[in-house]
Amino acid sequence: MAMLWLAVLLTCGAPAALLPTSGVGCPSRCDPASCAPAPTNCPAGETALRCGCCPVCAAAEWERCGEGPEDPLCASGLRCVKNGGVARCQCPSNLPVCGSDGKTYPSLCRLQAESKAAQGKGSAAIIPIQRGDCQQGQRDPDSPRYKYNFIADVVEKIAPAVVHIELFRMLPFFKREVPAASGSGFIVSEDGLILTNAHVVTNKHRLKVERSDGSTYDAQIIDVDEKADIALIKIKAKGKLPVLLLGRSEDLRPGEFVVAIGSPFSLQNTVTTGIVSTAQRGGKELGLRNSDMDYIQTDAIINYGNSGGPLVNLDGEVIGINTLKVTAGISFAIPSDKIRKFLAESHNRQSTGQGTKKKKYLGIRMMSLSQGKLKELKEQVKDFPENTSGAYIVEVIPDTPAEEAGLKEGDIIISIGGKSVTSSSDVSDAIKKEGTTLHLVIRRGNEDIPISVTPKEIEF
């Protein structure tokens, strides 16, 4: 690859007028006895006279060369070019190049000449390691990297509005806060409104938001739609904040490129790309209880860290909120048309001053195991259990009753209180019963495990 790169540099560009390297005036036979003594110190290396007989010092870059039999030839890699009546040795590539010695050379040929001289003195060879200046490199707007890297352009555009959200809980014994969970979100108003998933902020611990520039803020929960899994929180920041605008998810087409971005590790944004598998995967088809919403299915990887972050199109518009990963290659996002509806309803709720609500909370995200979904999972997950029904746990939220009881992602709830579970709705109905400890049987691999868990009441 290095040799190919050198060849490209050496062959790019066209000289004004190349002088011949052999021609009229040369003897029919070379007589070495007639040659002057061989040179001993040639900075640009040795070559032969144009007739190819006697050794002489080669002309270096920008030194004069000529047409006559006794005129010096250019060093290897240089061309004798005549401009304005004067012939000089020139490098086919006049672009700067960075050498392995950390110096910037005006051309590849100059670097090669310096390398040859260094080797003649017993030093290490200098090799080209980078086009352009050693400190800045070379930005070529016409190169394929800059012309066709549209994903990087999208990420650069949206990243400033993506935030990291961290939830804290208090340890009563030690009287200090510790991180309990985290997720992502994105800013939708210049005064600090942020959208994320409801499950990211459900436990209502203290929320801390960190932006990509490192600034941190305490956040307040403004509104939550548990059914749609959308939450609106707010920070107080000085000045106007960068925002993302919503696109229209109804215009999405299968096969369209999308970018999922999140900030699972504070300042370190993660980016995944994929295509839209379908823009209308029904919630009931996924086994999501009471769902009247279609989800966007994509093969862009969505995980717990970038959950709540934006799924954007190539125009940088938000067309969904990353929300659910079933397995590698099967992820789901809440469509932007549903987000738009939530924001309108939230405005109305705040205007009418509706109070908070309470609900029982277990801390899992699940889906029913339909025949179609079973087939998909068996294709994606090696050794998937031979189940025909149940509630598949897609995610266990940290610091929740589910995690404390020992439930894990990938478990399948097959019974509650001795009654078979056929869908996620059976689990949801059991959670709603007040003061009830749930006695579950879950299938983990090929083993059935009994687990007892008591849902917690939380306030929205």
UniProtKB/Swiss-Prot annotation:
Enumerate the active-site residues: 199, 229, 307
Cellular component (GO) terms are:
cytosol; extracellular region; plasma membrane
**Residue limits of the IGFBP N-terminal domain?**
22-92
List S-S links within the chain. 26-51, 30-53, 35-54, 42-57, 65-80, 74-89, 91-109, 98-134
The signal sequence is: 1-18
Listed GO biological process terms:
proteolysis
Cite a single GO MF annotation: growth factor binding
Q: What is its EC number?
A: 3.4.21.-
Q: How does it assemble?
A: Forms homotrimers. In the presence of substrate, may form higher-order multimers in a PDZ-independent manner.
Q: Mind telling me what this protein is named?
A: Serine protease HTRA1
Give the organism the record lists.
Answer: Xenopus tropicalis (Western clawed frog)
